[in-house]
Amino acid sequence: MKRFSAQYIFTNTGAPLKRGIVAADDDGTITGVEDTGGVLSEKESLEFHNGIIIPGFVNCHCHLELAHMGHMIPPKIGLAEFLRLFRAGRIAGQEKIISSAASADSEMYRDGTVLCADICNTTDTFSVKTNSKIKYINLLEVFGIDPEKANRRLNEIKMVSDIAESLGLSWSLVPHSAYSISLKLFSLLLAETGSNKITSMHFMETRAERSLLENQSGPLMDSYIESELIDGRPETVRDHVAAVLEAVTRSGNLILVHNTYADRDTIRKVNKRGNLFWCLCPNANLYIEDHLPPVDLLIGENCRIVIGTDSLASNNRLSILEELKTIHSFYPSVSLSDLIKWATLNGAIALGGEDKFGTIEPGKKPGLLLLKDIDLDKMQLLPESHITRLI
């Protein structure tokens, strides 16, 4: 058994414990948590660290199969142009895709991730996940704006789900976004997802989504025409609210990803769904659109916030801590305890893993991370703040 202490322990079950003690078995299961009142009376067989002990991170939005695309697409070009270059650059050899994914998986684990919702369009990362130390929830993503190809698109992703099932991997079928799926494909997908426990969807990532849905115009529409993805006017949901409340399954939790241009009216309307989580991937938002989601608005509307990294096509690292640093630098009023809760407990709840992850309490196996080089007086992250895995 191992026993750890630090300046503070954020258990997510109550107030931070000053110089508390957490004990764990060799397999990482928490066996005890002690509130010392800030006074350590014994130091024998105890590892004391200068920093904050927190549960392992939960990444609620990742694209591991795009790990080979690091530095291929220039930053700050907008989503429409990003997608155009993405379609051209995604193709790569199987060996490169798998080796890049394996490297990214190892780095993500070192950076503290214990549970991850990963978007899959193919089976490319399945071999990596069967040997990973990270628990993955595979969100098998379907997209297709051409209604004539709707049945084919659904059948393709169902073939991916068959392989995931045969390997014993956790999976759900999910839509890509409101703007990339025809009404017909939404309808077909809805019939297949009535028992989903977890669904996710890219949401309000760019202003161009609204112009496409409402007027069939703008940069995304131009991109579809240029890429010959559709012939004529697309048949889409009328707006983002209709996508959430009418087109997407009401079953289980729904994670809305990015929310870069979310507005108060839309937030209030879609929050009526219930079981809704708002995933922030700020570094990807800055990389693609050079714009951040309205974090203060989401907080003010009592949205349950979770954290994701997106992909190495739109980010330099798959590090949850780096995402938290970015949020803290632009929104310094957000408390460190809230940031940690978003990146741990909220994510665990969103992914249905709160029985094991997200809190430091007996019987759970959340992983233990040491958050170092922070401003302990102000409880703020610094550019040099970093994570060390204890378990």
List each language-model region with its residue ranges.
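His/Asp/Glu-enriched, well-ordered alpha-helical/loop segment
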Residues: M221, S227, A247-R250, C281-A284, ...
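Active-site gating loops and adjacent loop-to-helix segments of metal-dependent hydrolytic enzymes
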Residues: H68-S99, I137-F143, R207-S251, G274
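Active-site beta-loop-alpha junctions enriched in small/polar residues
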Residues: H63, N121-T122, E141-I145, H176-A178, ...
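Histidine-rich, glycine-flanked metal-binding segment
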Residues: K2-R3, I9-I54
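Alpha-helical scaffold segments that flank or form the walls of functional sites
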Residues: A23, I52-I53, H68-K133, N155-S166
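Glycine-enriched alpha-helix->loop->beta-strand junction motifs that scaffold or abut catalytic
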Residues: S132-Y136, E192-I198, T249-L254, K269-C279, ...
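Histidine-centered catalytic micro-motifs
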Residues: P55-A67, I198-R207
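Active-site glycine- and acidic-residue-rich loops that bind
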Residues: V174-L190, H258-T260, L286-E289
